[in-house]
Structures are given as C-alpha cells and as structure tokens.
UniProtKB/Swiss-Prot annotation:
It is found in: Cytoplasm. One of its GO terms (molecular function) is ATP binding. It catalyses: tRNA(Ala) + L-alanine + ATP = L-alanyl-tRNA(Ala) + AMP + diphosphate. Its main location: cytoplasm. Binds 1 zinc ion per subunit. InterPro entries: aa-tRNA-synth_II/BPL/LPL (IPR045864), Ala-tRNA-lgiase_IIc (IPR002318), Ala-tRNA-ligase_IIc_anticod-bd (IPR018162), Ala-tRNA-synth_IIc_core (IPR018165), Ala-tRNA-synth_IIc_N (IPR018164), Ala-tRNA_ligase (IPR050058), Ala_tRNA_ligase_euk/bac (IPR023033), DHHA1_dom (IPR003156). GO terms for biological process: alanyl-tRNA aminoacylation. It comes from Dehalococcoides mccartyi (strain CBDB1). Catalyzes the attachment of alanine to tRNA(Ala) in a two-step reaction: alanine is first activated by ATP to form Ala-AMP and then transferred to the acceptor end of tRNA(Ala). Also edits incorrectly charged Ser-tRNA(Ala) and Gly-tRNA(Ala) via its editing domain. This is Alanine--tRNA ligase. It comes from the Bacteria.
Amino acid sequence: MFSSDELRENYLKFFEEKGHKRIVSSSLIPHNDPTLLLTTAGMVQFKPYYMGVAKPENPRMASCQKCFRTTDIESVGDASHLTMFEMLGNFSIGNYFKKEAIAWAWEYVTQRLNIPAERLWITVYLDDDEAIALWKEQGVPENRIVRLGAADNFWGPAGDSGPCGPCSEIHYDFGQETGCGKADCNPSCKCGRFCEIWNLVFVQFNQDKSGKRQNLPAPSIDTGMGLERLTILMQSKKNVYETDIFAPIVEKACLLSGRKYGCDAATDRALRIVSEHSRGITFLIADGVIPDKAGRGYVLRRLLRRAVLFGRRLGLERPFLVDMAGAVINRMSGIYPELKKRQTYVLEMIASEEARFSETLATGLELLEEIVRQTKGGRISGQDAFKLYDTYGFPVEMTTEIAAEKGLSVDLDGFESEMEIQRTKARSSRKFSFDAAATAEAVKNMRHAEKTCFVGYELAIQKSTIKDILTEGGTVDSIEEGDEASIVLDESPFYAEMGGQVGDTGEIITGGGRFEVKNTLHLPNGVFLHQGRVINGCLKISEAATAHINEERRRDIARNHTATHILQTALREVLGEQVQQRGSVVTPDRLRFDFSHLKPMSKDEMRRVEEFVNDKIRRNLPVYAEEMPYRHALEEGVTALFGEKYGDRVRVLRVGRPAVSAELCGGTHVTASGEIALFKIMSESSVGAGLRRIEAVTGREAEAFINLQQDSLSELSGMLESTAEESPRKLAELKEEIDTLKKAVQNLERQMSRGEAEELLSKAEDYKGVKLLVSRMTSVNADTLRETADFLRDKLGSGVIVLGTVTEDKPFFLCMVTPDLIAKGYHAGNIVKKLSQIAGGGGGGKPNMAQGGGRDKSKLDEALQAVKGMI
C-alpha cells in the first residue's frame, strides 16, 4: 500500500523521468496576482507562461501544489469536501500535447499505480474525436469512453476571452454494487459509483469576446490530480479522514476531546471539521494570511471560528487550536518545511485569534439561542444576523449554518442591507470626500468628461486651458473673487489624491485672475478637480491658464512617499516576508503605513527598521520609474496590492540598482534616496487584530521631531534633578512611589466603605416580601462598590441590593440578586437597564449581578428612588 508521501514522490519522479522539471509548490497567496483570492490549482503559478508573457526554463514541468477553495466550506465535515488540498500536475508549455499527455497518464495509473484497467472509465468533450482515438490507442474500449458537454469537459477561458480547450478525465469505477445499481450507469451519473481521478486539460484555443475560437500556435497541457482523492483510492479507505494524511490530525482531535471517531455521525462530523479547518488555517497563516474582515483574511477567520464552534460541540471549552495546529505541523512539515520555519508565528496567531473569538462566543451563542426561540415565520432577521456578526464576531455563514440545523433560514438580503448601512457610515466618517463643489449631480453634468492629462512627473508648471468650472450650483462659465469652485484643466501638473498620496496644492493663473488650489481630486472618469478659491480677478471657461504646483510641498510629499516604499522593504526584512501592506497615507508632514503583523514591534525591531531605511538614504540610491505591461511587471516580481485594479500598462517605481524596492505606483517620488535626508519613526501602534500602524517623518520634520524629543528630555531631566541618562530610572522610582500611595488610599477607602456598609445593613427593608437595600454611596469607585455589594449580599442572605455612586463625574449603578429570588423571577440585569435609562445611559447583565451607567449624574437619586417600582 502506498503512503501519501510515497504517492507524491512517485508521481513527481515519474514525470521527471519523462523530462519534466520538478517545481516546488507556490504559496497559497498567488504571487503578485491581485485577481485571485487564493491559489486554486496547480497551473496558477504558471499563468505567465500560458499567457505568453514569460518563458519557462523547461517547457515540461511537474508539481504538487497546495491549493485552497472556498466554495464548499459549509460542506466540510462530510466524507469528501475539503478547503485545502494538494494537486498533482504535469504541465507542457507549447511542447507536448494530447498524445503524450494521454499516453503518460494511462501508463502512470495502470503501470505505476497498478490500478486495473477494467476499473477505469474516460470522459471527453463532445466533439473531441482526436482524444477518443488516442484513448483507444491505449486500449480503452469505446464503451468506457463517454462524451460530455462543456459543463463537465471544457475548460476556460478565465473571463470573457483567452486561452481555453477541451479536457478529458479518468474515472475509477467502484462497481455496480455501489451507487444507483443501474446497468447503464456511467461517469455522467452522480450516484457515487464513479470517482474522478485525473483531469487532463488540452489548452488549444484562444477565444475572443464574441465566442469565436482560433487554434493557438503552440497548444499546451495542464493536468490536475487530487492527492487526497488518490490516497483514498490507493489505501482502500472510505474517506480522506481515514487515510494517513488526516489520521494523525483526527487522532489529536479525539485525544483533546475525549471522543472516539466512528461512533456516531454528529461526533464524526465535528471531528472532521476541527481537523480539516485546523490544517487549512495552519497553512494559510504560514503563507502569510492574517485574520481580517474581508478577502482571504475573512476566509481564515471564518474557518478558525467554525472550528472553534464545532470544538465546543465536542466539549472543548478551553483553547485547543494551537494543539491541533501542532499536530498539522508535525504531520506536514516534512513536505512543507515553511510550516516548521514559521511555527512560532503560526501558533501565536492562532492563539490570539482563538482567544479573541472565545471572549464573545458564549454570549453570542446565548443570544443566538434566544433569537431562535423568538423567531417566527422560520426566518432569522438580517438585523439579528448582523448583530451576531458585528458584536459577537459570528460570520453570517456560520449563523446560517446553525440556523439551518434548527430548521430556520436567515434573511441574507436584510443582512447585506445592514452591512451597507455600516459601510455608508464608515465612508461618511472618512476624511476624503467631495465637497459641495463636486457633488454627484455636478459631476454628472460636467461639460468636459475627457481624462485630464497629467504632466506632473516631469513638470511643476504647465500652460493649460480651463475646460470646465464646477460650483455648488453646478457648472458655470466664470467665477470671481471669493468664489469657491473646482476647475477642470485639459493638462495639469497637479497630482490628484490617489493611492494614499494627498493631492497637490498651488495656483492656476489666467490673464484675468488667480485661483488658489487647496486640493486636487481624482474622479472615477479620470478627470482631475482642482478645488479652491478665487484670490483675485475672474477666471473663465476656455481661457488659457498657467498651472503651478506648490513645489516645496510636493518635495516633502515625495520624500515621504519614497520612504514609505523603502519602509515596506525594511519591515519584510526585519519582521518576515509575511508582512503585507494594508494601507498608507502620504502627506507633506508625515507618512502612515498600515501592515499585517501579529504583535507590537520591539524597540530593537523598530531600531533595525530605522537603520535599514536610513542606510538606503545615505547610499543615495537612484529612484526611477518605467512603464511596462502589467503581466511583465508581475513576472519580474514587482509588488502589487491585492484588490487593486490595474490597467494593461502599469508604472513601476524602483529604488536602487539592483532594486531594493519595486512596486506598482503612480505617485510622485524623489529622484535619489539621499533627498529624503532622514527617516524617524514617531509611533507604532495597533489598529486592529493582526494589524499594526507606523507613523514616521522625514527630512525637516524628522529633524524637528528629534529636536522636540531632546527638548522634552532636557525639561524632564531638570524636573527630576537628574541627567538624561538617569531620568528613566528616577521616573520609574517615582512611579513606584505613586503606586504605593495609591494602594494605601484604596485600602483606606475599603476600610471606610466597610464601615459604611455595616451601617447600610440597618437600612434594609422588607418590601413586598423581599429584603430590599437601596442606597447612594459617596467617594467610592466601581471596584469598591462591587466589594461593598458582595459584603451586603453575604450578610443579607436573601435580598435585592441596589447601590449607586458618582464616579468620574458620571452616575454608576450596581445590582445584586440572591439565588432564591432569581428563582422567583427577579433579574439584576433588567433592574440596572431601567436605572441606566433614567440617567441617560445603558447597562445590563446577568440575573445575579449587573452594572451600568449614565450620562446625567443629577438623575442618580431619581433613579434610585424608582427601584421600588421595579420590584
């Protein structure tokens, strides 16, 4: 019996013997291909070869590629569906074609794997007579060759045009005793009797947008065979979880949960989900994916949270995914060494994300159960689904899956409406927006919609013509002194805000007036809006004008923009290749760079990043740009941002020869790195889970920042009566002394509150058969209030306690209810909720204890007086 590792090696060795070059698996993150979410097939890393923009060292290649598909996540847990899998493939780029591909595939399965030929069936595309003839040459009888349509046996194009071709598949027949039992059953039947082993794609046509196909001058081969499916077959197992690929991982899940595999369907499903998703998230994180609210990061977060949910169903209440990931690494790192190399990072990321979700999971599940109980009409509202997503981190797919188990559906349209409301709020809160002079209606009615010709890479001053003028009221023919407007030019040296770089400022001057440009915006149609105000005179449409940017400001922006590029390289050098840009802002006075990283940077790491950037500045490296076809840029390894839309031709910005940095960028930059002068990090902070932000300054601003730090240190040293070197120690001693005094004050407060609590016991009264103690306390904080309530509850034995105080100039309430009264329907959370509303706030909690606050401290006594009405 073949092991899965032997099958992988056996396949690659076979094709090496056929003259193929063995190619290692590429990352699950497609290399410089923003059009793809994740690597979904073996041919992805060879796309430039198939598209003719690059030439391989050897036109024959073979690989075992790790792949990831997201279409059937909810189906994972059955016997067949996987997210992450390995695909064996052999590829020909204009070398061999159908004859060799078919002959070698047949030779491999029948002679190397020794699969009985009588168990194999073939499917071909409807009119691919050539393929049928070639299969017959291999000895396949015609009654085991089935013609199928395009849905099953035609590949591509990947879009509305491009390379495509018919395909042919090898299927294994489990026998008539499996499936529907019909005598005429064949691979077109979905009864389970037949299992696809291998798909051979014959890339022989180029299809245009009209659907017309022409033969490619050099047809190619792209094949794919799932290792997991092949292993099931060769090890005579019922499903992949019983093979040696997954068995150690499933065994770990059983060990952690105390459950046995194979005892009942529900347990088996949960064990499979935990095992499969653990493997998927381990590989995703090792390849640089981080949890996020969108894109591939959302896929990772969704899998991890689904694994945690099904872990709970196995009784795994404590974090367990780190242990599961360890089992995955132990099993797979011999083949994929990057797992071992990045083990610490992977496990830290998993631990952080699992802990984050666990904080809200229990409360979220309680809310979901309540929603299920209250749902009428068999459908959970989009508003409820959104609350579970937004407040408790439940992916809507997970809510849908749980609801389906209860016989309910989810209003996904309503959920999407809530999401759009949130997105709209987010957009409205952003700094970037069109002002009144550039409203949608005005833009719609523009008289000049041709793209503005940008000449600002070479020129700071440009003679131009005013093509349109927009004001709050719409388009106008002229503007006068004091008028605010947006001017459209046919040619402009002004850079329009885009790609994180702010727009240029400056002046537009005509024979009759002067216009101050305060910002430049880039419309979706390519038109630049020069926004500002008329300083003097009058400007008219069709008038000749001279556009002049603020050159000093532009130079400051350029320093920061080039520094941002070098910074990204430095972060990858210091923190690792998993670092990815998640956003940037470049202004004249500073730069901001958001990037993926799990934990705060250490002082040493920040120092090393600064040293890297400043070293490149001192070297005065050339900074230069060139235009090239987009695909050529990707083949050269130029950095592109996922999710960005690029045209056929792109601008590549490089720093150094050879390049220290090479990125697709349309912004403005210095001509040599020495112009940056100096780089200094101001701060490094968190802006979300797995997301960090650096703010930095360059040039004059860096010098000013350092001077400010030195002045502050000198002032502090004077106050501490110490040298600059001694100040940190002196400050630490002073802080320790303050902390000691604070503790002494807190102890004194506790003693005073305990005495006050003893007096409060006498104020407890019987009200409607319940011991009720309501009081306002003074000069106590929230912690002391809780300790007092604990003391009173223990002393009363049975009762309802409501205490109020003013802390940080706001009212604060706390309620405790003893267990015997909870059984009678009294609920601390409901009481606090009503109290907080009276004081203009909110709050709530559990039946036994709840707390809340308000905004109006003058309402504290009124709220406490209302307690009896709530009993």
